[in-house]
Every structure is written in structure tokens, then in C-alpha cells.
């Protein structure tokens, strides 16, 4: 490979990969605490599996980096106009090198995931294939692209829990659903925010297909569903009272984001508020165990 390590790390968007890896490790921690608290009957030792949690972090880091690299490979034309400084359009990484590099990362991540257990491996393989499909096709498909990002981001927590088998997945399934709904809503809002630029680039997004107003209603509906379902982890005895207190702050943030979109027609502010609300939701997940 002709490019240096720093260039390939840039291609991976390593900072985002680090955050995704930490999120997966948090998923492992939350699932462990839920299972060990006696709300389920796990078949594993009481000691926290630090090695497997480290492998979970590594897998998500690699697969996320692969997804970013393959995304840049398919976005060469757009990035040459909008992001000419990126590794591929700037000529620092050849397109073929980026392509092979992404598949190498996908393969490494999936193999490591299968070394943890078959459930981890299956999720890693499915997500890798979905990331490739997203970069090639789904990214330009209205709604399906938004749903894909919602699933992929939410599944990071689910993947972290999967080291405990189906018991771990069951423990975090509601949290995965809430995260996926909130992220899908924000993705739609981001598309509304980017309508002008996407229109100039000839992109086919949900707001451009059905209009900003209808897309906004769908984002509001999805966000409200996340808010309405947010108490479920408490009522299902998955998380404790601290979760309710903190998730209430997140819910206020989501409602503020909805108001900015629906009443004030400000998708930029709405998108920022969604992001802040999701941060509080993550804190609620961690503290609520």
C-alpha cells in the first residue's frame, strides 16, 4: 500500500471508530450488569469478561472503519467536489487500495467476532454486508438508508451484549429499539437539513422524494415513538429508577428537537438537539443499571 498509516486511519475516520467501539463496550457493561443483577439467569461467571469486551471494541473499530472506507470508495465523485481533501479524492490513497483495505478490515473484524461466539460473528457478518450494500445502494434509497443507519448504530450496543449469547441480546433489545428509533429520526432530520445540497448533487433522499413537511412528520412520529417507549426498560425491570430520572432529561431534549422541527421549522437546531438528547439517553442507560 502506497499510503501511510495516518492516511489509512483518516480513511477509516478513526475517531468515529473509537466512539463506536466504546459504545459497544458500554453495551457489554450494561448487559453484564443487567444479567448479573438477577433480572435474568445468565450462564456465565460473575467476573466481567474484559478480554471479550476488548475484542468487541476491536471488532466494532475495524468494521466501522471498513464501512467508512467503502463508503468513500463509492463516493469518489461527490467527495471530489465536496470533500477534495479526503484521502481518495486528494490522491493520497488509490481507489483500489481503499476498496481492498475495506474488505481486509471487514474480514478481520468478522473473523475476530466469530472467535468470540457464533452470535457475535453472525452480527458482524450481517452488519458488514449491510454496510457494503448501504455504501453501494441503500445510501441513495429514501427511508431505507435512514433505517439502515438507525439499525447499524443501535446494533453496536446489541453487539456488545451478544458476547453473553441470546440472554445478552434479550437484555438489551429494548435499548437497541429505542436507540434505533431515535437515530432514524435524526437521520431523517439531517436529510431535511441537507435538502439544498442534496438537490444540487442529484441525491435521492426522503425529503426530496416526498417533501420536507411529510418527511418532518415521519421524523416527529419516529422520535415521539422513542419518547413514548422510553419508560419500558424501567417497567420491564431492565433498568432502575435512576434511568427514569435521566431518560426524562433525554425525552425533554427529544421533545425540544421535535418542536424545533415541527413548530419553528429549524432542522439544523433540531438535529443538534437530537444529538444532545441521545447523549443523555446513553448516560441514562449506563446509570440506570
Curated annotation (Swiss-Prot):
Nucleotide-binding recorded as keyword: no
Bilayer-spanning residue ranges: 18-38, 47-67, 99-119, 120-140, 163-183, 218-238, 243-263, 269-289
Cofactor(s) needed by this chain: Mg(2+)
Recorded family membership: Belongs to the UbiA prenyltransferase family. DGGGP synthase subfamily.
Subcellular location: Cell membrane
Keywords: Cell membrane, Lipid biosynthesis, Lipid metabolism, Magnesium, Membrane, Phospholipid biosynthesis, Phospholipid metabolism, Transferase, Transmembrane, Transmembrane helix
EC top class, as a word: transferase
UniProt membrane topology term: Multi-pass membrane protein
Disulfide bonds: none
Classification via Gene3D superfamilies: UbiA prenyltransferase (1.20.120.1780)
Catalytic activity, reaction form: sn-3-O-(geranylgeranyl)glycerol 1-phosphate + (2E,6E,10E)-geranylgeranyl diphosphate = 2,3-bis-O-(geranylgeranyl)-sn-glycerol 1-phosphate + diphosphate
GO molecular function: geranylgeranylglycerol-phosphate geranylgeranyltransferase activity; magnesium ion binding
Entry function: Prenyltransferase that catalyzes the transfer of the geranylgeranyl moiety of geranylgeranyl diphosphate (GGPP) to the C2 hydroxyl of (S)-3-O-geranylgeranylglyceryl phosphate (GGGP). This reaction is the second ether-bond-formation step in the biosynthesis of archaeal membrane lipids.
GO biological process, one term: glycerophospholipid biosynthetic process
Main location: membrane
Pathway stated in the Swiss-Prot or TrEMBL entry: Membrane lipid metabolism; glycerophospholipid metabolism
InterPro entries: DGGGP_synth, Prenyltransferase_related, UbiA_prenyltransferase, UbiA_sf
Any one cellular-component term (Gene Ontology): plasma membrane
CDD domains per UniProt: PT_UbiA_DGGGPS
Enzyme Commission number: 2.5.1.42
Name of the protein described by the UniProt record: Digeranylgeranylglyceryl phosphate synthase
Originating species: Methanosarcina mazei (strain ATCC BAA-159 / DSM 3647 / Goe1 / Go1 / JCM 11833 / OCM 88)
Amino acid at each position: 500500500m502506497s499510503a501511510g498509516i495516518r492516511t489509512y486511519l483518516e480513511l477509516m475516520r478513526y475517531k468515529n471508530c473509537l466512539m463506536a467501539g466504546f459504545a459497544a463496550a458500554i453495551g457489554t457493561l450494561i448487559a453484564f450488569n443487567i444479567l448479573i443483577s438477577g433480572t435474568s439467569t445468565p450462564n456465565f461467571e460473575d467476573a466481567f469478561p474484559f478480554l471479550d469486551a476488548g475484542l468487541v471494541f476491536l471488532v466494532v473499530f475495524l468494521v466501522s472503519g471498513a464501512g467508512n472506507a467503502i463508503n468513500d470508495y463509492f463516493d469518489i465523485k461527490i467527495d471530489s467536489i465536496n470533500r477534495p481533501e479526503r484521502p481518495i479524492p486528494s490522491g493520497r490513497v488509490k481507489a483500489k487500495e481503499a476498496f481492498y483495505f475495506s474488505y481486509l478490515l471487514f474480514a478481520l473484524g468478522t473473523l475476530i467476532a466469530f472467535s468470540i461466539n457464533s452470535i457475535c460473528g453472525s452480527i458482524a457478518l450481517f452488519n458488514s454486508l449491510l454496510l457494503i450494500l448501504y455504501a453501494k445502494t441503500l445510501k441513495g434509497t429514501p427511508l431505507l438508508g435512514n433505517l439502515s443507519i438507525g439499525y447499524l448504530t443501535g446494533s453496536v450496543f446489541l453487539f456488545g451484549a451478544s458476547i453473553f449469547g441470546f440472554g445478552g441480546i434479550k437484555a438489551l433489545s429494548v435499548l437497541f429499539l429505542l436507540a434505533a428509533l431515535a437515530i432514524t429520526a435524526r437521520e431523517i432530520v439531517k436529510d431535511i437539513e441537507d435538502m439544498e445540497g442534496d438537490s444540487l448533487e442529484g441525491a435521492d433522499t426522503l425529503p426530496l422524494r416526498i417533501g420536507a413537511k411529510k418527511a418532518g412528520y415521519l421524523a416527529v412520529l419516529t422520535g415521539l415513538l422513542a419518547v413514548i417507549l422510553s419508560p419500558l426498560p424501567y417497567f420491564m425491570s431492565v433498568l432502575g429508577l435512576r434511568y427514569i430520572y435521566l431518560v426524562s432529561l433525554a425525552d425533554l431534549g427529544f421533545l425540544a428537537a421535535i418542536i424545533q422541527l415541527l413548530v419553528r421549522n429549524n432542522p439544523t437546531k433540531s438535529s443538534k438537539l437530537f444529538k444532545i438528547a441521545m447523549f443523555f439517553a446513553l448516560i441514562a442507560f449506563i446509570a440506570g443499571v
